[in-house]
Each structure stands twice: as structure tokens, then as C-alpha cells.
Amino acid sequence: MLGNAMVEACPAEGDAPVPITPAGRPRSGQRSYPDRLDVGLLRTAGVCVLASVMAHVDVTVVSVAQRTFVADFGSTQAVVAWTMTGYMLALATVIPTAGWAADRFGTRRLFMGSVLAFTLGSLLCAVAPNILLLIIFRVVQGFGGGMLTPVSFAILAREAGPKRLGRVMAVVGIPMLLGPVGGPILGGWLIGAYGWRWIFLVNLPVGLSALVLAAIVFPRDRPAASENFDYMGLLLLSPGLATFLFGVSSSPARGTMADRHVLIPAITGLALIAAFVAHSWYRTEHPLIDMRLFQNRAVAQANMTMTVLSLGLFGSFLLLPSYLQQVLHQSPMQSGVHIIPQGLGAMLAMPIAGAMMDRRGPAKIVLVGIMLIAAGLGTFAFGVARQADYLPILPTGLAIMGMGMVCSMMPLSGAAVQTLAPHQIARGSTLISVNQQVGGSIGTALMSVLLTYQFNHSEIIATAKKVALTPESGAGRGAAVDPSSLPRQTNFAAQLLHDLSHAYAVVFVIATALVVSTLIPAAFLPKQQASHRRAPLLSA
């Protein structure tokens, strides 16, 4: 597939491979590259950054809007979380197809098609009349956004060449880091000033600009001979994940996991996922995801760590803005500003993590990162349980979490491919990228379900919904309130705050426990650097 673009971008076979998802094949023949970053390359990088930042910012923007969706659509957190879950499932679906699609259509056309799909999805989201259509249109966005990062890397790898790739990726990485910092602020400001629909409408001029610039700047490339696509694998994995998560997400409304409306889709989804695993294991030619890579112990441990870590991490991240808005009574704009310490922590740790990984290899820095995430998330949970004000506990926890993310996510991607042969790097990178998205999608659904369960078991919160004391109240939407249902105690507001804080604290503690559990597989990651060891080759 188009994994050759990444392999040729590596200076030497013995060097540590770059942990990315490839999607481009260079043209046959030799090509000479200048040593400096010329104007043409910087223009190409600028277009790639414009589109990729748009997709990255959109994720953080939508997380800030979760409570607004609950109020405007009269829905629950478990249902609204599908605006994130559906998007991440779409990412997990298209990432394995990126290499085949770029071979089939060419990287230039695929990039432009992905930008167009994301922009069209943004427009549809902006006009969605109900939560169901908003979720569906978010999936459309995800199909476009999932292609942008791997295709952008393939284009940059082809245009930069091996000697300039590191420098151009450093240039590209700066605005990519600013996305998670600026996204919550932008989203909060747009929601407060113009309404939630503008968090999607703002993508239209950016997407159209990226589309026009790509048509002008990117060199034309012809489609190449592509591998046979694993349609069966795609038809098993995507519906399996969606059906399983739909069943789990239905449990709060049913009151029990034993309800048939929960069990039937959950069991059906698990059966489809099991069938996908069996299909991928025995498919010898070009499976959607090469499950045989799990025979490599380092690959198995890195992917297990990434999946569970994403489950706890992404699930808790979804609820951070909701907690700030619902319990601390912050506006969307304020909650966006108060999440900034997380991005600042990540920016601070980036150069340190990179230097440590180069000197020590990924295993040790991954352990440090996981411990930092657990410490930060635990600190945040402690502040929530104590009903603490924002300062100083909560920003401290967020900053530590941000540092831990940088020290764990990227090194884990490196650990997943460092023992693979060059021809296996593409598949290994795809595998861990998919598991990151799958873990994140399960985490967003699971944590929202747990929070909804906590809400449903609180009589105070249930009463508050009726009297418009929470954003999802019936009275707030014009429903009649029976005065006899109101509580007699005088400290109702204090008790409501206690129950809300307790509900969020329980979920954050569970997320912390999941993060801590990843120390077990992470402890067995290979301690040597890639240049010091090479695992036996698996079959191609």
C-alpha cells in the first residue's frame, strides 16, 4: 500500500520508525530534494496544517458544547455523548482504509475529497433539527476528518524527502499543539455569543479555503495500482462497534443491563467484533487490520496499553467541560478558558518527552506519562469530591494530565512499531491508531453512561430536572411542575451540588483506576531502543 511513503522518508532501516498512519506512495524513480525548507514545501505544509487544525479544533469545540446540546435538545448526557462517540467510531473506520483510498484515487484528490466531506458534514451539523441527525452528521464529519491526518503526512513525506521531514514536521506540529488550547476558547465564545450552530458554521470558510488552496498548491499525482480491499472486515468491524456501544448506551434509560433492548444489540455487536477478529486473523492478503501483529509481544502490550488508556482518558475529557458548566456554573466560554492548563501542560512537556524518548526509548517515558495522567486525573477527582473551587486544585490536575498525555500517547505509538520490520510499520501504525480511536469511542460512551446512572439514582437530581435547577430540566423547556413534588428541606441547592459533585467524582475515580491499570502492560514494554533490538519478522 502507500506505506512506502513513510518507509522511504526514514533515513535508514535501523533508525526508529516514525509512528504514523501512512497514506501515500511516491512515484517511481529517484527524486532529489534541496536541504532547506523552500517556499513550495512551506505552502504545502500550510495547506495541510489548515485542514488538520480545523479537524483537531472541532473535537475540543464539540466537547465544550455537550451541556448545551443536552439543554437545547432536551436529551441526556448518554445520548449527547454520541456526538463524540459517533465521530470517533467514524475515525476508527476510515483510518485503515486511508492507504488503499490514496492508492486508488491519489493523495491530492483524496485530501480534497476529505476536506469537502468534513466541510459538508459541518454544514449539515449546523442545520441539524434534532440530536439524532446531529449524531449522523457528526459521523459524516468523522469520515472526512479521519483521512486528513494520514493523507497530510503522506503528502508532506513525499514533498519533503527524508532529510527535511523532521524539520517540516516540527513546523507543522506547532499549530497542531495550539488547536487543543484554542479550541475550547473558540467554542465557548461562539456558543455564548452566537449559539452552538456556529461551532460548525465556522468550519465552512476554513474548509473551502483549504479546498481551493489544495487545488492550487498540491502537485497532481496519479492513482496507483491498489491492493484488494477488505470489504468483509469493514462490514464486520464498524457495525459491530456501533451496535455494541448502542446497546451499552441504552442501559440508563432501561434501568438495567439485563433488559433485552440492551442485551440484544450488545451481544450482536460483540459477535460481529469476534467475527472480525477471526476473519482478520485468517485473511492472508491485506486484512483491514492485521491481527497477526499481536503475535509480537511489544505490539500487543503497546496496543493493550493504548486502548485502555484511551478508554479512561477520552471518556473523562468529554465530561470536563460538562462538570465546569453544570457544577461550577461556568459559561461555555469560561469552561473553555479553564481547560487551557491541560494544553499548556502538553506544550511544556513536548520537548522534554521527545528528548527522553530519543535517549531512553519509549518504554520508560510511557510509564512516566501514565503516572502523570493518573496523578493529574486523581487530583482533579479529589477537587471534585471536595466540591473545591476552580483554583488551585483543578488547574493543577489539568496541567499534570496534559503533561502525561504527551509523555504517553506518542511514545506508545513509537513502542508499537519499533520492533517491526520496515514493511510492517504501516500496518502496525494503523493498528494502534485504530485502537486509540476505538478505546476513545468506548470511553466516551461508557463514562457518559456511568454519569447518567449516577444522576438517575439521585432523587435530588431527578427533582432538580423538574424545577429547572439543572440545564436539562423539564420546566426550563416549558413543562409543568407539580408543587407537591418539590423537596421540603431548606438546603436543597447545597444537596443538589453535593449529589452532582459526587456523580462526577465517581466517574473520574473510575477513569483514574482505568489509567492506573495500564501500568501493568506498560511495564512490560521493551526497554531497549529500536536500534538495539529487532523482533523476528512476521509474515507479510
From Swiss-Prot:
Name this protein carries in UniProt: Multidrug resistance protein B homolog
Localization per Swiss-Prot or TrEMBL: Cell membrane
Cellular component, GO, one term: plasma membrane
Segments passing through the bilayer: 45-65, 78-98, 117-137, 171-191, 198-218, 229-249, 262-282, 304-324, 337-357, 365-385, 390-410, 431-451, 505-525
Topology of this chain in the membrane: Multi-pass membrane protein
PANTHER family: BLR6921 PROTEIN (PTHR42718:SF46), MAJOR FACILITATOR SUPERFAMILY MULTIDRUG TRANSPORTER MFSC (PTHR42718)
Keyword hit for Zinc: no
